[in-house]
Amino acid sequence: MKFAKLCLQPVLVLMSLSLTSCDKNDQMGVLGEEKDKAKIIFVNATPNAATQPAAAQREIAIYPFYNNVQFNTFPIKFPWSNGYKAFSPGTMTMRFDTAQSQANNPPGGAAKVGELTFQTEADNYYSVYSVGTVQKTEFVQLNDDLSLPTPGKAKVRIMNYSPDAPPLDLFITEGTATEPVALATNLAYKGVKDFFEIDPGIYTIEFRLAGTSTVVKNKTRVIIDKNSCYSIWARGFRQVPSPGNTFGGYAFDISYHANRWSNPL
């Protein structure tokens, strides 16, 4: 199987939500460096649900294999990604193995946790998320419509990948605006609102319990650039399995990343 790393850099903004930009001369709004290839990004959205104190602290990462080829030097930790990779189009079978990081004691061996087969087409983009928990992992494959939005606009997609959260609404507020605007409502676990257009800006975003004003989590200064495509998703546990022991990064939070980014300068 032939594969190549894709030059398009998905700008991951998963933990701190501070945007890492490309060089200002690199106009990432133009796709096509890997013509006639299918492009796939893997995102680890799978927290550790262990209830035993020692096990609850462990960060258990995942190795993705593509048609039996594994070319990541390190496993992908929650809630990170390995970026888009380019492959010959056709049938893609992805296998996923857990791999415990060096922080774990004992480190343990890798173990298969799942497999996913889907068809790919040339010049199309796909996202694969591991969801659920490390103890019961599921996989979601999404087709990524990375066509450019209307000039001056941006596109966003919204997902609920928090395994224990009830249905959620997503609201945004720009600048000093006093009234939040609902972008998605009643998103159940694994629910997706596919790409749609919004105005670019610097937003406060918040997930609320569906149909209420109860805010589960909010993030400020979320940068949405024009002519770009973003995914926004709920992650982690609303109620951590082992209070006081569960690794802090597994608590409910908001992630977003740019599937396609255009330099606004």
Model feature map: region roles:
Residues 1-10:
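Bacterial N-terminal signal peptides that target proteins for export
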